[in-house]
């Protein structure tokens, strides 16, 4: 890359950041941060823990936007200063370092812009992610377990905390179901892109004849709603509460006491399990919170369908639709059928490198909004 081209890129980044700044209202955000931090310094701040945590989360979200912008602007200023130095006295090594910085900077701006776009009403929430194998016994149960690991690795790389809330192992291998609580800013905003059916094509390790098999597993993702977000009343007569022994990765008291909880909500048919906590009381509280989140999400989806009918829109059916194929044989390819994003790096994807698929889907849906 010639010096003149490097300079054009730096100038373009400066223009991009100026445009971004114009939409941010940084001064107002910094005022809000100051107000939140004054609240956090009050001696009675933790009297209402739910409200306190909400203020902390909002403050952290604002600081991420403000500090993210300032960091990007400082990097552009540094690149500009380095270019000026090269004009005064050329140095090949310095020029190569600057060229690499210019190349890498685009990805940083793209990531920052994507975070700004995650401004849906629940995008900032934690996420509840469930995996269920399709028909096919051990083969599909093993596929669900592979997806379980993929999402764990993705969340680890994103800095999200993963709690296994419920885990039901397969008969021979894999899992029959798993429920994860994924904690982190914008966890739902990112992971909502994964809702749908995932298809695997491979030579089965469970088939002695070495035949090719196709397996399916479904992924469901809903926001983990805060109690003050949910206006849902549950009639005690509408639910059945059962206890059972914890059965796997999530249970800390495995096969010792019946601390795990299953709640069945009869009007909706929704069933939730929780075995993550040591005590039955805490598992019941967590399960009720999850049930409320699911019922609230159901209510929101019904409202969205009603609005779509009023507007006369044809909505895409998300649940039950195949969103992505993972082909291990006869060639290596992972392809998202919604965006046509694809890669031949199957091993990297299964190790959690699904960011490009999520980002391309989010950008596509945002451009259609």
Swiss-Prot record:
Answer yes or no on keyword Cytoplasm.
Answer: yes
Is Cytoplasm tagged as a keyword? yes
Instruction: Just give the chief location class.
Output: cytoplasm
Family stated for the protein in its record: Belongs to the prokaryotic/mitochondrial release factor family.
Q: Under the GO molecular function aspect, what terms does this record hold?
A: translation release factor activity, codon specific
- GO biological process entries: viral translational frameshifting
User: Where in the cell is the protein located?
Assistant: Cytoplasm
InterPro entries membership = PCRF (IPR005139), Pep_chain_release_fac_I (IPR000352), Pep_chain_release_fac_I_sf (IPR045853), PrfB (IPR004374)
Summary of the function given for this chain in its UniProt record: Peptide chain release factor 2 directs the termination of translation in response to the peptide chain termination codons UGA and UAA.
Concerning HAMAP family, the annotation shows: Rel_fac_2 (MF_00094)
Residues with PTM N5-methylglutamine: 252
Modification(s) after translation:
Methylated by PrmC. Methylation increases the termination efficiency of RF2.
Further remark: The gene for this protein contains a UGA in-frame termination codon after Leu-24; a naturally occurring frameshift enables complete translation of RF-2. This provides a mechanism for the protein to regulate its own production.
Question: Taxonomic lineage of this organism?
Answer: Bacteria, Bacillati, Bacillota, Bacilli, Bacillales
Which keywords does this chain's UniProt record carry?
A: Cytoplasm, Methylation, Protein biosynthesis
Under the heading PANTHER family, the entry gives:
CLASS I PEPTIDE CHAIN RELEASE FACTOR, PEPTIDE CHAIN RELEASE FACTOR 2
Q: Please identify the protein, giving its name as recorded.
A: Peptide chain release factor 2
Matching entries from NCBIfam families are given as: prfB
Originating gene: prfB
Q: Give the GO cellular component terms, alphabetically.
A: cytoplasm
């Amino acid at each position: 890359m010639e010096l003149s081209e490097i300079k054009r890129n730096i100038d373009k980044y400066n223009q991009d950041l100026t445009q971004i700044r114009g939409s941010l209202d940084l001064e107002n955000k910094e005022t809000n941060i100051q107000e939140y931090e004054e609240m956090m310094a009050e001696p009675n701040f933790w009297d209402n823990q739910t409200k306190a945590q909400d203020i902390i989360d909002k403050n952290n979200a604002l600081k991420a936007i403000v500090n993210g912008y300032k960091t990007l602007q400082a990097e552009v200023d540094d690149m500009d200063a380095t270019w000026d130095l090269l004009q005064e006295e050329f140095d090949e090594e310095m020029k190569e370092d600057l060229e690499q910085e210019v190349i890498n900077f685009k990805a940083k701006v793209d990531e920052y812009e994507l975070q700004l776009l995650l401004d849906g009403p629940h995008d900032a929430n934690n996420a509840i992610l469930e995996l269920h194998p399709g028909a096919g016994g051990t083969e599909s149960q093993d596929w669900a377990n592979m997806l379980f690991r993929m999402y764990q690795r993705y969340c680890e790389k994103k800095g999200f905390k993963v709690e296994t809330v419920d885990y039901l192992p397969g008969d021979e291998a894999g899992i029959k179901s798993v429920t994860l609580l994924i904690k982190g800013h914008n966890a739902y905003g990112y992971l909502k892109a994964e809702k749908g059916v995932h298809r695997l094509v491979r030579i089965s390790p469970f088939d002695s004849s070495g035949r090719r098999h196709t397996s399916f597993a479904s992924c469901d993702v809903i926001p983990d709603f805060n109690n003050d977000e949910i206006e849902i009343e549950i009639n005690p007569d509408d639910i059945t509460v059962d206890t059972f022994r914890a059965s796997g990765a999530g249970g800390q008291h495995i096969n010792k006491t019946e601390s795990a909880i299953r709640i069945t909500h009869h009007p909706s048919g929704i069933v939730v399990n929780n075995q993550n906590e040591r005590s039955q009381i805490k598992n019941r509280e967590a399960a009720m919170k999850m049930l409320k989140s699911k019922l609230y999400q159901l209510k929101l989806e019904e409202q969205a369908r009603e609005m779509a009918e009023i507007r006369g829109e044809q909505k895409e059916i998300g649940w039950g639709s195949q969103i992505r194929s993972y082909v291990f044989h006869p060639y290596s390819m992972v392809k998202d059928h919604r965006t046509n994003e694809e890669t031949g790096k199957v091993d990297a994807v299964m190790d959690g490198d699904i960011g490009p698929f999520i980002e391309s889907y989010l950008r596509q849906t945002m451009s259609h909004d």
